[in-house]
């Protein structure tokens, strides 16, 4: 798969929050942009030009531009005698001293357990505590809201700060630390909040590392019977890993500075270029991957499995922190989809229809009316890889599942005698040979003479059919290769009798780590290449996309060359058998030959000079090598190239011929989790509601009414005879029925003295049995009635107005003044399903219900086929387009950047990246969305599907009914 292009998505700009220096920032808030623009800030006199180059300018979410003062790193601030110390520094040093004193005071029998608990506490404070704060800050700017709500950064002389002592302490603390270009009173709230946050981070990080080192000291020792050579080797390797870890941290801090080190862009952005340098060219997420090598070096020096296990646990927790906290924020901040190109209808999206030929066959109708799709590469509608893509209606998945079940049965039901072991090893070797040599030959012939595609074209099939068949062949071959290897490893493996004997436990740990490394590498390769690149799509479609190096390919040209086979060698470590060593050597040799003889020539032919010679890791290593070693490296490359050329000539002369198959199984059950997390009782009640009259509270709704057929579906022919007519209603109010996904405006009233922390939530009517207390979580479907009342900005999204005095007349004809307001529920604050719902007005941030709206129904209307002529394809398609367009717009939150304005307009890029949008449309329309690209293609797919199914339709108007047997005389 080498350096193949990524066929889908946009190259991610960063690999971790701490891995980037800065990014040209954009205001992401809704507040007013300050009139002092960045350009005005940069207009400095010529005499100050030298100083201006050193300045960094930050931008808050509301657009305010400020100068970011230079700051010192954590270790220098705390440990350097030349740095001024303040109360927080002394406090941190005192805590560290208490840790060291505790190690000296505790008896040896309690040290290990005590420091294990202490380290786990600080690690949880890091990954869970800091992670939660950053998550809340990223999604709702919670930390900044806390600061603004408490007014701790406001000068007490204004009379708005109720904490003057805290203000003075913070001002002295921060101005002592940052003496240049910084004013506590003039700095934005976001920057001051970040400075306070980083002091908390300093405490947690220093205590985390110190407690880990003390735990290693408590566990450290020398194994019985260890030789001096082994002792020296263990300490040399351990110290090397620690020094490497130290270099990684220092080089990373050199690149990203304090801004990214302390997650600065959760608070504000800085206007600088994005840079990747040094350690960031070597590995993805270096702070969290190779940056933890020192943990394993310390484990090696301590010679303790306890230290090793707790190191693995800490490392895993750090990766969870990366995946759950940093990566979502990076995607949201730095990888925003580009705006959709708004183009007029072109020939690529027009329907080639011939209404006069509609009387012909269904096949010809479909061919003539299909949208002309671009032939650059196939649109991936039904992926193969991944458990969530398993489709038991697909022959490929059926074949793979049956083959895996057969392998599992043979492996578990046969004895592990030498004869069976030999058969399983031979089977694994044959599958590996086929996977590399056979598949390699097919790809080589496809590259040179389009052999695979020509075969299918010869029998009247298209190149897309050849591509689908190839994917099945490769997929089955790959799964059978790894299944046979796993079966052979299982047959050769014997369960250890004594886990403490020798290096048995260490071998299993290292083996499992290598297997996990291969799984991660494979998933990273697939994430970078997509389905098109994974199955060597550029061998089948010449119009390949531009070559890009994203994801893992930023660091390695061919990650499968070494890391892609790490799991094979992990199995060798676990089993410790010569047979597995043979299979591993065979696999590695054939993989290298495949890359050199099949992939590399095709890539050079296809991409030519645009191919990168050295990846980021190689460039970094070459820069650090002396000239003599660089010459040796060049000589080795020359020898390898000549050897592979000889092998290539030999294989070209032999031309072996081999054949094919298919893979996968499982079903996605995530739909269950969409419904049941709300079934948790979380009620918080206000004990004193005296002084509030429930008659003053009210909720009224405004929304988009659905199409007329949706309102009359209840009175259909499937009901009883007396229920087929419209219901007679006493009174003026009609049933509230709103469109699926359409925004709903909520108007509320409340007493003038109502709490500023009141809020309105959206619920299913059946969720709450009580009308006085809400007993289930709103799951984010709520809006505050007043601004700045909660520690999050997401709860204010949709708020239009608050506390507008309105005079109303009660039922007892008494006129009174009440507070009123409006809000709009849309997007993620709506339920994306059908049902009956209600809004509830809650008091003072609790779950006491003060008012409940009228129940309303969300309904998806059925398309009325009787309003158009069934035989007129053009009219049917146009009617389907008109019916689909508003549904799709609602599902895309009516966002002009992603929602189409016409049937021909393509969806925005965010639809492909965030699956919730396509799932909404699939629920409403029950047809594939993402691959269609626009409403016109979706309508075409529906219309032609109806043509194919017309002979089986139960509707007399639109197709023949189910055939019945007639008795003839």
From Swiss-Prot:
Pfam families: PEMT. It is a multi-pass membrane protein. InterPro entries: Phopholipid_MeTrfase, Phosphatid-EA_MeTrfase_fun. Pathway: Phospholipid metabolism; phosphatidylcholine biosynthesis. The chain crosses the membrane at residues 90-110, 114-134, 200-220, 228-248, 282-302, 305-325, 400-420, 422-442, 474-493, 499-519, 565-585. Disulfide bonds: none annotated. It comes from the Eukaryota. Its EC number is 2.1.1.17. Residues 1-40, 705-725 are annotated as: Disordered. Residues 1-15 have a biased composition (Polar residues). Residues 714-725 have a biased composition (Basic and acidic residues). GO terms for molecular function: phosphatidylethanolamine N-methyltransferase activity. Residues 1-89, 135-199, 249-281, 326-399, 443-473, 520-564 are lumenal. GO terms for biological process: methylation; phosphatidylcholine biosynthetic process. Residues 111-113, 221-227, 303-304, 421, 494-498, 586-969 are cytoplasmic. It is an enzyme of class 2 (transferase). It catalyses: a 1,2-diacyl-sn-glycero-3-phosphoethanolamine + S-adenosyl-L-methionine = a 1,2-diacyl-sn-glycero-3-phospho-N-methylethanolamine + S-adenosyl-L-homocysteine + H(+). GO terms for cellular component: endoplasmic reticulum membrane. Its main location: endoplasmic reticulum. Keywords: Endoplasmic reticulum, Lipid biosynthesis, Lipid metabolism, Membrane, Methyltransferase, Phospholipid biosynthesis, Phospholipid metabolism, S-adenosyl-L-methionine, Transferase, Transmembrane, Transmembrane helix. It is found in: Endoplasmic reticulum membrane. Catalyzes the first step of the methylation pathway of phosphatidylcholine biosynthesis, the SAM-dependent methylation of phosphatidylethanolamine (PE) to phosphatidylmonomethylethanolamine (PMME). Belongs to the class VI-like SAM-binding methyltransferase superfamily. CHO2 family. This is Phosphatidylethanolamine N-methyltransferase. The lineage of its organism: Eukaryota, Fungi, Dikarya, Ascomycota, Pezizomycotina. The gene is CHO2.
């Amino acid at each position: 798969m080498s350096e193949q292009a990524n066929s889908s998505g946009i190259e991610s700009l960063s690999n971790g929050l701490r891995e980037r220096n800065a990014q040209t920032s954009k205001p992401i808030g809704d507040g007013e942009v300050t009139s002092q623009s960045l350009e005005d800030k940069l207009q400095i006199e010529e005499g100050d030009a030298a100083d201006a180059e050193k300045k960094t300018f930050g931008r808050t979410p509301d657009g305010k531009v400020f100068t970011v003062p230079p700051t010192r790193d954590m270790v220098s601030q705390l440990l350097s005698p030349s740095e001024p110390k303040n109360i927080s520094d002394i406090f941190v040093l005192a805590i560290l001293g208490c840790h060291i004193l505790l190690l000296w005071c505790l008896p040896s029998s309690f040290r290990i357990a005590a420091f294990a608990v202490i380290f786990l506490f600080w690690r949880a404070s890091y990954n869970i505590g800091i992670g939660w704060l950053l998550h809340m800050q990223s999604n709702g700017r919670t930390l900044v809201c806390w600061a603004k709500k408490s007014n701790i950064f406001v000068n007490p002389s204004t009379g708005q700060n109720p904490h003057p002592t805290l203000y003075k302490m913070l001002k002295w603390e921060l101005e002592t630390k940052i003496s240049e270009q910084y004013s506590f009173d003039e700095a934005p709230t976001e920057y001051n909040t970040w400075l306070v946050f980083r002091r908390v981070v300093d405490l947690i990080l220093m205590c985390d590392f110190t407690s880990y080192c003390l735990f290693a000291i408590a566990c450290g020792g020398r194994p019985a019977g260890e030789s001096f050579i082994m002792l020296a080797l263990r300490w040399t390797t351990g110290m090397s890993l620690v020094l490497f870890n130290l270099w990684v941290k220092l080089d990373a801090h050199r690149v990203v500075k304090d801004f990214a080190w302390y997650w600065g862009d959760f608070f504000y952005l800085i206007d600088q270029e994005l840079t990747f340098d040094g350690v960031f060219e070597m590995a993805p997420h270096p702070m969290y991957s190779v940056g933890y090598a020192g943990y394993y070096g310390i484990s090696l020096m301590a010679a303790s499995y306890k230290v090793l296990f707790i190191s693995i646990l800490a490392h895993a927790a750090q990766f969870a922190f990366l995946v759950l906290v940093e990566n979502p924020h990076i995607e949201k901040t730095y990888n925003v989809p580009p705006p959709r190109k708004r183009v007029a209808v072109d020939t690529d999206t027009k329907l080639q229809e011939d209404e006069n030929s509609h009387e012909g066959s269904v096949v010809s109708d479909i061919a003539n009316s299909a949208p002309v799709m671009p032939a650059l590469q196939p649109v991936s509608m039904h992926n193969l890889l991944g458990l969530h893509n398993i489709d038991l209606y697909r022959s490929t998945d059926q074949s793979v599942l049956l083959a895996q079940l057969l392998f599992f049965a043979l492996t578990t039901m046969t004895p592990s005698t030498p004869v069976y072991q030999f058969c399983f090893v031979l089977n694994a070797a044959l599958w590996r040979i086929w996977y590399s040599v056979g598949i390699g030959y097919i790809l080589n012939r496809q590259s040179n003479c389009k052999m695979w595609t020509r075969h299918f074209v010869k029998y009247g099939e298209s190149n897309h059919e050849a591509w689908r068949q190839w994917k099945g062949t490769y997929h089955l071959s790959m799964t059978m290769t790894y299944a046979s290897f796993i079966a052979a490893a299982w047959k050769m493996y014997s369960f250890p009798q004594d886990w403490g004997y020798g290096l048995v436990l260490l071998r299993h740990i290292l083996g499992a780590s290598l297997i996990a490394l291969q799984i991660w590498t494979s998933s990273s390769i697939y994430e970078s290449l997509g389905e098109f690149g994974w199955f060597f799509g550029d061998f089948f479609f010449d119009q390949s996309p531009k070559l890009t190096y994203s994801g893992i390919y930023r660091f390695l040209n061919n990650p499968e060359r070494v890391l892609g086979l790490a799991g094979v060698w992990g199995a060798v470590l676990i089993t410790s058998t010569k047979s597995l060593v043979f299979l591993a050597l065979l696999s590695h040799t054939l993989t290298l030959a495949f890359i050199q003889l099949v992939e590399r020539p095709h890539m050079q032919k296809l991409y030519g000079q645009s191919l990168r010679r050295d990846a980021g890791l190689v460039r970094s290593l070459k820069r650090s090598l002396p000239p003599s070693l660089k010459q040796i490296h060049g000589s080795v490359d020359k020898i390898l190239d000549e050897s592979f050329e000889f092998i290539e000539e030999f294989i070209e002369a032999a031309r072996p011929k081999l054949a094919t198959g298919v893979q996968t199984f499982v079903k996605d059950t995530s739909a269950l989790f969409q419904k049941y997390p709300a079934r948790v009782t979380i009620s918080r009640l206000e004990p004193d509601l005296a002084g509030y009259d429930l008659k003053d509270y009210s909720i009224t709704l405004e929304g988009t009414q659905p199409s007329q057929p949706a309102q009359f579906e209840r009175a259909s022919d499937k009901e009883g005879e007396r229920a087929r007519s419209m219901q007679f209603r006493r009174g003026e109010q009609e049933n509230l029925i709103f469109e699926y996904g359409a925004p709903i405006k909520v108007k509320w009233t409340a007493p003038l003295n109502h709490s500023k922390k009141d809020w309105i939530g959206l619920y299913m009517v059946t969720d709450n049995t009580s009308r006085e207390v809400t007993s289930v979580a709103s799951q984010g479907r709520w809006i505050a009635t007043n601004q700045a009342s909660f520690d999050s900005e997401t709860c204010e999204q949709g708020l239009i107005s608050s506390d507008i005095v309105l005079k109303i007349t009660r039922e007892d004809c008494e006129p009174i003044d009440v507070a009123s307001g409006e809000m709009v529920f849309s997007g993620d604050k709506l339920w994306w399903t059908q049902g009956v719902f209600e809004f509830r007005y809650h008091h003072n941030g609790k779950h006491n219900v003060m008012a409940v709206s009228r129940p309303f129904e969300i309904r998806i209307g059925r398309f009325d086929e009787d309003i158009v002529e069934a035989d007129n394809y053009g009219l049917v398609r146009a009617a389907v387009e008109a019916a689909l367009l508003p549904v799709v717009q609602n599902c895309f939150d009516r966002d002009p950047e992603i929602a189409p304005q016409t049937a021909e307009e393509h969806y925005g890029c965010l639809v492909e990246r965030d699956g919730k949008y396509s799932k909404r449309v699939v629920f409403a329309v029950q047809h594939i969305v993402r691959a269609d690209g626009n409403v016109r293609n979706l309508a075409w797919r529906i219309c032609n599907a109806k043509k194919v199914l017309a002979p089986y339709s139960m509707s007399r108007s639109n197709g023949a009914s189910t055939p019945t047997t007639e008795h003839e005389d």
